[in-house]
């Protein structure tokens, strides 16, 4: 049998200390020869940094750990592996603890074993440290040699550490975020009272913080919680209160702002309650002399000096003073109410007059604005998609523009736009556009009927390719006569001005706005013909 054989069987027949010494020395020399110059056992960080009493490697090996690298005591991977003279391998701390606790014998075969007979198995240590293990952190799929595990764990982004505030295990990469945003024991400052508390009691603090904003349940007024009780007891106009005469028998309850009206409406009833109360007090007071007539002189003197009798008289005087005070207050309140009613009527008349003046000023402003257009008016039809949806649903859409003048002085006109429904005869899904004359400020200064050229256009807001139609007025039509009502019911224009399909295909609608332009030139303008634009024959109004 060769002494340098590293298999367990090489130690089965060893029975003397001298044989052990020579064999152990030879094996130690051979094992050291297997280690590279940079892989001396003393330089392996995983084993050298471990406490001497630590058990084996409790890690997940991939592939699973072979039984020859498993400590028979802790059943984990051999840590700081040592060998016994009988050829068994143990963790250094495990076998030493076993010898101290259970006696000087090998736990496997019960052979006599002393601590000084143990020697490091550097060959097994190197093999174990070269095995592949998985990171034990949840969510991490990294694999590495066992010797690299400690370094990886110190850098693993899935590594966890206990929160110093709540002791919850948290990934190290999220620890700062946890301490500042999620930890239930993090310190918070109340924005209302500037007090400090842990987040776990935040809800309780918010419910009882005296400086927190709250809302009165009666009037919905915002105020701090510390003022809420006083507000409800003295100031809140909608808080329920008892009648001032509740001590005299009135059982009515109402809101504080209705108390004055109740006091005014039920004055007689309150006086009746007061009279009944005083009568009962007077009767109770009068029964005392009749009862005193049957008493001896000494008893009558004692009765006269009775504190109850004095107290009743004092209460009666106080009640009479209260009645006089309330009657005076009632008279003053009646006078104030009458004055307030007169003042209120005056203010109502003033408000009505101011509203009338406001309407007149608004009308004058619109009239002045209309006179500034000088016959060229651009009408912004906003929210046009809404009108299109109603048109598609079969609802007739009729829109009128604000009025405008052809000059100063000039004719007052407005535009009328129809979105014809899909079921309309001969003009379905068309835009119809007409011009109407209106009663204006300068009608008496103008010649009638209106004569001239009218140019209508729907503006292309993207490419500038506007849809334009030009028409001449016809003096014999009612549409151009001087209107006898605010707006001439007869219009002049085109029933089929523009198809809605063409409207959608081009840039006529931008930001949900359609622009319609009208240019009116009283008296015929020959320049239109010189520009090559021939008037299109108008169509009768519908």
UniProtKB/Swiss-Prot annotation:
Which annotated residues bind substrate? Answer: 489-496
Where in or outside the cell?
Cytoplasm; Cytoplasm, Cell cortex; Nucleus; Lipid droplet
Q: In which pathway does it act?
A: Protein modification; protein ubiquitination
The catalytic activity of this protein is classed by the Enzyme Commission as 2.3.2.27
Can you name one GO molecular function term for this protein?
Answer: tumor necrosis factor receptor binding
Can you state which reaction this protein catalyses?
A: S-ubiquitinyl-[E2 ubiquitin-conjugating enzyme]-L-cysteine + [acceptor protein]-L-lysine = [E2 ubiquitin-conjugating enzyme]-L-cysteine + N(6)-ubiquitinyl-[acceptor protein]-L-lysine
The record's section on SUPFAM superfamilies has: RING/U-box (SSF57850), TRAF domain-like (SSF49599)
Annotated zinc fingers (RING-type), start-end? 71-110
Specify the signal sequence span.
Answer: none
Q: Cross-referenced Pfam families, in alphabetical order?
A: TRAF-mep_MATH, zf-C3HC4, zf-TRAF
User: Which GO terms are recorded in the biological process aspect for this UniProt protein?
Assistant: innate immune response; lipopolysaccharide-mediated signaling pathway; non-canonical NF-kappaB signal transduction; positive regulation of DNA-templated transcription; protein K63-linked ubiquitination; regulation of apoptotic process; regulation of canonical NF-kappaB signal transduction; response to bacterium
A single Gene Ontology CC annotation of this entry is: cytoplasm
Q: What class of enzyme is it?
A: transferase
Coiled-coil segments? 311-373
**Residues of the MATH domain:** 374-520
Sorted alphabetically, the keyword list is:
Coiled coil, Cytoplasm, Lipid droplet, Metal-binding, Nucleus, Repeat, Transferase, Ubl conjugation pathway, Zinc, Zinc-finger
- Please indicate if the UniProt record lists Cytoplasm as a keyword: yes
Q: Where is this region: Disordered?
A: 32-54
Zinc finger motifs (TRAF-type), residue ranges: 151-203, 204-260
Q: What is known of its domains?
A: The coiled coil domain mediates homo- and hetero-oligomerization. The MATH/TRAF domain binds to receptor cytoplasmic domains.
Summarizing the function annotation, the protein's role is:
E3 ubiquitin ligase that, together with UBE2N and UBE2V1, mediates the synthesis of 'Lys-63'-linked-polyubiquitin chains conjugated to proteins, such as IKBKG, IRAK1, AKT1 and AKT2. Also mediates ubiquitination of free/unanchored polyubiquitin chain that leads to MAP3K7 activation.
Q: How does it assemble?
A: Homotrimer. Homooligomer.
Q: Which PANTHER family match?
A: TNF RECEPTOR ASSOCIATED FACTOR (PTHR10131), TNF RECEPTOR-ASSOCIATED FACTOR 6 (PTHR10131:SF152)
Q: Which family, according to the similarity comment?
A: Belongs to the TNF receptor-associated factor family. A subfamily.
Its protein name is TNF receptor-associated factor 6
- Species, as recorded: Danio rerio (Zebrafish)
User: What gene name is listed for this protein?
Assistant: traf6
